[in-house]
Amino acid sequence: MATLFIADLHLQTEEPAITAGFLRFLQGEARQADALYILGDLFEAWIGDDDPNPLHQQIASAIKAVVDAGVPCYFIHGNRDFLVGQRFARQSGMLLLAEEERLDLYGREVLIMHGDTLCTDDQNYLAFRAKVHTPWIQRLFLALPLFIRRRIAARMRADSKAANSSKSMDIMDVNPQAVVDVMERHHVQWLIHGHTHRPAVHELQANGQPAWRVVLGAWHSEGSMVKVTPDDVELIHFPF
């Protein structure tokens, strides 16, 4: 019995090794799980479910095969792929979840999320996030021709990279009080998230008791997952 969590694969055609590693993961470890949760940034960018990128169809088919094998797959949007919609969800067999979800895993209450909303010290990012999550702005963007959406997405990624290069490492990490606040709001002692690309298990205090925050790593030269069993919560890195 095990439930698996992954995040921050940032799949793109320019990184075929990561795609190959993910496909092997779906054909192997994922098939043995009780469920698979993808906590955002599965893709480096997402400009709409109507994008005919062959990579998207390949990934949808691979995830659907896992679902068809009896392993439910769930998805929480990240800051790169927040426009993933119901069309792709149907193609892949995944169920789209809310930004914050509380799970009962073998008697252990666990909160899961992408993690970007915990970075409350980065006010510029939060302002940008609020803007691009505005429903009418999303509808307007998705109504644009694909070639224009690609240009906008490329410019946004370039601007984000430039902005992050001038930010301190601390400002791009989670705010400790934001972590405690969200755990106490959901009455949990465990939090699993991604986004920061700083894999670790942090011990803290929440709800007047010991608590743990497990941070998933990004997939670069190796894979990263959290494996929850009735007896343990493990942060695991593995070769592609």
Curated annotation (Swiss-Prot):
Family recorded in the similarity comment: Belongs to the LpxH family.
EC class (word): hydrolase
Role: Hydrolyzes the pyrophosphate bond of UDP-2,3-diacylglucosamine to yield 2,3-diacylglucosamine 1-phosphate (lipid X) and UMP by catalyzing the attack of water at the alpha-P atom. Involved in the biosynthesis of lipid A, a phosphorylated glycolipid that anchors the lipopolysaccharide to the outer membrane of the cell.
Any single GO BP term: lipid A biosynthetic process
Xref: Gene3D superfamilies: 3.60.21.10
List of residues binding substrate: N79, R80, D122, S160, N164, K167, H195
Catalytic activities: UDP-2-N,3-O-bis[(3R)-3-hydroxytetradecanoyl]-alpha-D-glucosamine + H2O = 2-N,3-O-bis[(3R)-3-hydroxytetradecanoyl]-alpha-D-glucosaminyl 1-phosphate + UMP + 2 H(+)
SUPFAM superfamilies: Metallo-dependent phosphatases (SSF56300)
Annotated EC: 3.6.1.54
Binding, Mn(2+) 2: D41, N79, H114, H195
Source organism per UniProt: Klebsiella pneumoniae (strain 342)
Stored Pfam families: Metallophos
NCBIfam families xrefs: lipid_A_lpxH (TIGR01854), PRK05340.1 (NF003743)
Pathway: Glycolipid biosynthesis; lipid IV(A) biosynthesis; lipid IV(A) from (3R)-3-hydroxytetradecanoyl-[acyl-carrier-protein] and UDP-N-acetyl-alpha-D-glucosamine: step 4/6
GO cellular component: cytoplasm; extrinsic component of plasma membrane
Annotated binding of Mn(2+) 1, by residue: D8, H10, D41, H197
Main location: membrane
Record's protein name: UDP-2,3-diacylglucosamine hydrolase
Molecular-function annotations in GO: manganese ion binding; UDP-2,3-diacylglucosamine hydrolase activity
Cofactors demanded by this protein: Mn(2+)
Subcellular compartments: Cell inner membrane
Membrane topology: Peripheral membrane protein
InterPro entries per UniProt: Calcineurin-like_PHP_ApaH (IPR004843), LpxH-like (IPR043461), Metallo-depent_PP-like (IPR029052), UDP-diacylglucosamine_Hdrlase (IPR010138)
